[in-house]
Amino acid sequence: MLGLPPFAYASPKTVEEASEILVSSQHAVLVSGGTDLYPNIKRRQVEPRLLVSLSGIAALRGIRGDGDRGLTIGALSTLEEVATSPLVTGRYPVLAEATMSVGSPQIRNGATLGGNLCQDTRCSYYDMPLGWRKGVGYCLKRGGDVCRIAPGSDRCWAVSSSDIAPVAMALNASVSLVSTRGERLMGVKSLYRNDGVSHLSMARDEILTELKIPPSGGLKAKYLKLRQRGTIDFPLLGVAVAVRLDEQGVCTLARVVLGAVGSSPVEAEASEEILTGGKLTDEKVKQASTEASRLARPMDNTGLTLQYRKAMVQVYVARALKALAA
């Protein structure tokens, strides 16, 4: 059985205090729910000397707002709190769908919104115990100089596996980042980098404090998730689609975002252009879903074959669009 190594533990009471600790210690790592981090520590993917817990910072909890003014969700809100909040289920049901698809009831009651947005990228090679990785040879993401999945590449192709990120992008959400230098607002799309090693566009001492979702404005959205089992599993493909239809059924706005097919969520802008300005006819749906599948570039570093996952992009985008057109 894999165990945790020794480490120091800090429990600051404010975001500013937590950020100051990150500045003072280069070996400090943030933890909130820990449902992703602790297994990674057990596998020695991360070896922190100091864990900085955010669980004692009350200001990071809570959900406030509505569909008319927009919604602000504290980063320490658990996924169960998000999935069952009337503020979410009433005006942003797609966010409830995505959060309810994560893990199990036990995991959702511990895992946090901020943790899901910031969780590490995944790879079938990297996500192995230390002894296995040491025997085969380390990879570019941890301790080595080659990507074992794509040896000819000079970058890491570990996969973004957040269920919340594609939905947040489809809703045009933003996040608040706080550090000792102050606070800044960043669109969720800009939060992610297409790099399996350094996948977040955050300074080391920045802390994600809130997710801000703009007024719904009649936006309809759907999230579909491909996985090997009906529960627990990380996405092998996540599809978030949002559309705004006028009274005649004409699509005036479309967003199509693919998760788990790259090191960051992928926005299918060509599909969005196809959908905008017309009704969601079968032909439009086929064109948009085909274009999304063409754009997807999954690697053979997670469950199921990359060919199957790529083919299912078209199927899932089409399903989501048809559900929204109904």
Task: Show which residues each predicted segment covers.
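C-terminal structural segment of proteins
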Residues: M1-A326
